[in-house]
Amino acid sequence: MEKAHRPTHSKAIVFVLVAVVSGTLMDTLLKVAGAHVGTWQLLVLRWSFALLVLLPVILTGSAGSMHIQSWRVHIARGLLNCLGSYALFYALATLPLSVVITILFAEPLFVIPFAVLILHEQVGTKDVLAALLGLVGVVVMSQPDVSQGDWKMLLPLVAASSFALLNVLTKKWGAQESPVSLMLWMAVSTLLITIPFAASQWVELRWQDYGMALAIAVLGSVYSYFWIVGLRMGNVAKLTQLSFLSLPLAFGLGWAFFHEAPGAVTVWGALIIAAAVMLLSMNMARVKTAHVFLRRLFKPAKS
């Protein structure tokens, strides 16, 4: 059994690593594109190309059923995705890459209160401490700017909390649909919401902008698929710790491409948030099976 388990876990590690790198590269391209493209227009381009990326999988029938269980679920997910994505895209265009990704990294910590309120799940003292510690890290990173009236530092916080709530709602109501179906209707609902806003301020784009939007969509789809499948194959409590690689990767990309040298406050905030997520992961490793953590955060559950 253990020999059979090792190749699967090794494959899971590769999948999660691919997801982490793809997600960080996607955020980097979003920052580049945000300098030339408006946020609403970029949202439309990102999800239009995401829809095109999914179409071959859907048309071949390899993605399973596209049956919709509840339109309310997809509308709610679309609204949350619009809110989170808009906040993320605007934050990436106006804030240092390392700051945005570090605060967004605290997303699992925001799942805890939503899981209690919506799923009525019980959480331990260490879970609460991890969430509070992560909040301290966010405050440390954002306090200097917010105290000076720069509220843009709150945008990554809005994005992280929106995506956390989206994950919890997916767990509560999305079990009877395939992952590709959830991705498809997410793209459709997001486009229906964003197109009217983008149409009023649409500007002519360069071919490079369209190419960048396509690359962003591909990287986003790769991230979503490899992250979900990787976590389902392996020990989630261990695999999620690989996501820490996104922090040094974001710091390195920010320094190399945007000449962003992180200050002491940013580094301290990043360390505190990383410690909080590590505490949460270590606590989850002590439960009877890591799949409890998987079901709590990532795998949709039957309503």
PLM regions and their residue ranges:
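C-terminal-most transmembrane helix of multi-pass membrane proteins
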Residues: 2, 248-303
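Membrane-interface helix-cap regions at the ends of transmembrane helices
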Residues: 2-3, 51-69, 136-148, 190-209, ...
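Transmembrane alpha-helices of multi-pass small-molecule transport proteins
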Residues: 11-15, 36-83, 162-166, 185-200
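Loop-to-transmembrane-helix transition segments
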Residues: 11-18, 58-59, 63-87, 151-159, ...
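Transmembrane alpha-helical segments that form core, pore/gating elements
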Residues: 28-31, 39-40, 54, 145-205, ...
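Alpha-helical transmembrane segments of compact multi-pass small-molecule transporters, enriched
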Residues: 49-53, 103-117, 132-133, 189-193, ...
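Helix-helix packing/entry segments at the starts of transmembrane helices
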Residues: 100-106, 173-188, 224-256
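Loop-to-transmembrane alpha-helix entry segments
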Residues: 101-104, 120-140, 146, 150-153, ...
